[in-house]
Amino acid sequence: MSKMNFKRILLVTMTLLTMTSTAVAGKYKNFKVSTYIRAQDVARMEDEKFLNQTWETVSSQVDLDKIYLETHRDAFIVPEKTLLKVKKFFQSKGLEIGGGITFTRSEPSDFETYSYARPEEREQVKHISEYTAKFFDDFILDDFFFIDLKNDDEIAAKGNKSWTEYRLRLMADAGRELVVGPAKKVNPKVKVIIKYPNWYDHFHGLGFNLEEEPVYFDGLWTGTETRDPGSAQHLQNYLSYNIIRYFDNIAPGKNGGGWVDAGGIHMSMDRYAEQLHLTMLARTPEIILWNYMQLNDVKIDARMRAPWQDAGGNSFRYDEMVAPFQKNGKTVTPTTMARFADVTLHETDKLIGLLGNPIGLASYKPYHSSGEDFLQNYLGMIGLPMDMYPQWKEGQQQILLTQQAAKDPQIVEKIKQQLKKGGDVIITTGLLKAMKEPLGDVVELYCGDLKAIVNDFGFLGKSDREFIIPQVKYFTNDAWEVVSAGRPLTGGVSGYPILLRDTYSKGMLFVLTIPDDFGNLYDYPAPALNVIRRAMSKDVGAYIEGPSKVALFPYDNKTMVVENFNDTSVNLRVVVNTKVNSLRNLLTGETYKPATLPQVVSGWGRNRFFGYADGATVFDITLPAHSYIGLGY
């Protein structure tokens, strides 16, 4: 090779390295942080004073890499002159620029969407897509690319189909014909991204088509807001992580990031920070802080300081967040929630780069399936790490099936094959009830309409409250109870399975009893939860022991994050299923030595699920309220 050619190759290599470095270089090491401006607020930015003042407030408190400018919402389109002016302003601040569309006609009217059976409204949607593609090389459809109307035109177009069938076909076609196709004719380079909201288990009823849309859209985005679990949607904290993983598995490589708004911040700063943190634990490449005006307007309030902050040692530290700090040579006094986001994401960034790829207990949810809605998020909150897939996941030692799996007409055969390979299948009582006849060829178990009120788990402890469970019936000596409950069970007259096991071929089938109110899973006593966690830890290689509302996030490089969602500190045990010398805090370097415990080796039958397996290693840790720890072994 000549010196000249060598120099050329070296120059090209250096250029590529520089381009790669520039592409990932930003305010954060492991992800991008972005925000989004609604169309009406973009229009207000025609006023330069407003534009400059809001930017000063937001940018002084949170580091941003990108901003999305919305062109349409509620039948309003931002004028071209204003859009170009605002775009130029943010480009001058060093931000990447993307676009956005919200296909609503009136949010105040129960999020009224466009009527896709009406030709004139279809033309409006097409025009908005074309208009947006003129200005941006990527744009996001915010949340509302579904249909919630049952007007006379939609009723006539539906015909004899169910609403779900009609809407799934209607919106899959509308995405191709009215959004992606027209946009790419205007701008062949444009990437059109569909952002899905957080209510994934109900998507199909409104026309969100997770089977087809992620194929032809250039990317997707994930709503990770869980807000206040007591509000209308009743979503559990864990969903902020779980939904990212589910969408990653639907369209590997196409999930652009998460999306969190200010919802839940009235509960405490911690509730907002947790949503951001959990989103990033799923190793997503970007997060959108929705929206820009919330970052400007939602003021810091002393009521956002939770009582548990007094104990100290928390991962999210209110007093530090609201203290004055230095930025670009100036002293900044925090005034809005933007500061909460900045501190949380910079702290999380320190941890994310040390983690591998997320892993968990594979749970099969077929496309457009219903039943035991959002249950996996409750299971995540009792320490079972979830990893949801739209297809059956081969090569797993264990598979979790909820009632949703009944939608697959081949589900019984898939269960048989998993068991014949020596794997485990864990089914819920919801699936058992839905599949009584087909499952009879595998196990003769029955779950009907009979209920029981329980609060006593025998030697595994008692619940602080009574709750209702479905009764599972089985043949003695054909299936075996691993965890039982009654009222009372100790010295009582009856008991019912909470975790039941049966064998088939080389494998084992478990039935996990789900209470009528999923929230009562949090009332299972810690020793009972420990048995359940251990029985379902084969693919993860580790589990936790302790109360509910503590989640485990494992990764494929022998790291994990343990997070406490309780309002009080908790004492926990981290159990690694193999022998290891120590457990280390990934951020501080502190090491934990194995606990000195009598190793109870698993015995025969039911006893194999209690104590610790031969070779397992146990570590004791304490986690403050609403805090997390990154660990490696």
Go through the PLM ranges and name each one.
Residues 23-26:
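Boundary at the C-terminal end of the N-terminal hydrophobic targeting segment
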Residues 28-53, 83-137, 143, 147-151, ...:
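Active-site-adjacent "subsite" loops/lids of carbohydrate-active enzymes
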Residues 377, 386, 402-633:
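A conserved amphipathic helix/loop scaffold
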Residues 43-61, 119-132, 202-213, 268-279:
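Short, acidic/polar
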Residues 1-10:
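Bacterial N-terminal signal peptides that target proteins for export
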Residues 11-20:
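Bacterial N-terminal signal peptides
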Residues 38, 65, 70, 110-113, ...:
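Hydrophobic targeting/anchoring helices
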Residues 47-58, 375-396, 403-406:
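A short, well-structured beta->alpha microelement
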